[in-house]
Amino acid sequence: MKIEVKDSTMIKPSAETPGGSLWLSNLDLLSPANYHTLSVHFYSHDGSDNFFDAAGLKESLSRALVEFYPYAGRLKLNGNRLEIDCNNEGLLLVEAECDGALDELGDFAPRPELNLIPKVDYSRGISTYPLMVFQLTRFKCGGVALGVANEHHLSDGVAALHFINTWAHLSRGAPAPTPLPHFDRSSLSARNPPQPQFSHAEYQPPPTLENPLPHTDIAHSRFKLTRDQLNSLKSKFKTAPADGGAGKSYSTFEVLAGHIWRSVCIARGLPEGQETKLHIPFDGRGRLQLPPGFFGNAIFFATPIATCGEIESNSLNYAVRRVSDGVSRLDEDYLRSSIDFLELQEDISKLAQGAHSFRCPNLWVISWVWLPIYEPDFGWGKAVYMGPWAAPFEGKSYLLPNPEKDGSLFVSITLHKQHMERFEKLFYEI
């Protein structure tokens, strides 16, 4: 399939907005340099003549930027610290056409060679590129793809979807959803003086392979688990009874993350003494009681570490318990300690997580199940699929909801090709 760009427009707020600079928290500064997260929303044609009318979308996007004005700004340095310059330069909306049809994309596995998202030019410096970039691609079947590139220093997935859903509301003639965005990040300031209470393994270098693997191709696959399969897997696990109690059931995420971790460890066939670190992003909004509509990064990490031998020789319950213990540890004291720990670092950006963090022998499991990824309705119905579109990194996996809302979900994972077939077999042994 070929994609041809037809138009590019810099969209600015439709009314006057505040200027000045927006302070970035330590969690914002953990984002990698020169990096936008990439995702795509796919919409089937609903038969209307004005399906995803570009003029209307530009107008509603301009109005959405009045409330979400930092997206029209640019990054800048204040001394050695990044911040957002709310200079009203705008965000980019690209229009394109594709000579293929949506059904040719199959299960919508990421195909980075298919340019559904504009490439951001980082070569001219941080003050030159937009913080949010959209691409509206029309397929020959009439369907469209809305590609999104979000600069992570400004917002995490929760905040970005808040903006996109506001745009969608305005596009279809509905009022903007509440709450309004809350840009003040002072609730994530470090204490004075900083008081870290823990060693914070999540910010320590990940384990490396004792015996490096030869260079091999990687494979990306997506696996579906039905509601019945999930319930069957989850029903096998309960925490140990405490003080004569009945014990507490593990969450679906804890069970599934443990199952993925163990299956990956076995599929990789690493030595028993090889350490493996599981990275689990965690939204801290609730436990820190951040203001409604908090707009920024509120992502912390649970990072249980074990040897491959411990994961493989014990039952699945061991891996699930390690996941549960890691997530449970992230209480308010731990999260505040994390912010203080970062405050004491000379260069927070050196702790940014990336491909080096979760490649073999490690793993990244992130859940988008709780994100409202299928909420954005621009007036022509909701997406038939939404998911990541970045070049797949080995060791990265996503839990994705089914748009049919039938209780099933998908696991999208990237592994070395020689490990994927074994992983699939182990994954379905439930």
From Swiss-Prot:
Gene3D superfamilies: Chloramphenicol acetyltransferase-like domain. Pfam families: Transferase. Residues 178-210 are annotated as: Disordered. Keywords: Acyltransferase, Transferase. The active site is at H152, D377. InterPro entries: CAT-like_dom_sf, Plant_Fungal_Acyltransferase. It catalyses: (2R)-3-(3,4-dihydroxyphenyl)lactate + (E)-caffeoyl-CoA = (R)-rosmarinate + CoA. Signal peptide: none annotated. GO terms for molecular function: rosmarinate synthase activity. Optimum pH is 7.8. Its EC number is 2.3.1.140. The keyword Mitochondrion does not apply. Involved in the biosynthesis of rosmarinic acid, a compound with antiviral, antimicrobial and anti-inflammatory activities. Can use 4-coumaroyl- and caffeoyl-CoA as hydroxycinnamoyl donors and 4-Hydroxyphenyllactate and 3.4-Dihydroxyphenyllactate, but not shikimate or quinate, as hydroxycinnamoyl acceptors. Can also putatively catalyze amide formation with D-amino acids as acceptors. Belongs to the plant acyltransferase family. This is Rosmarinate synthase. It comes from Plectranthus scutellarioides (Coleus). The gene is RAS.
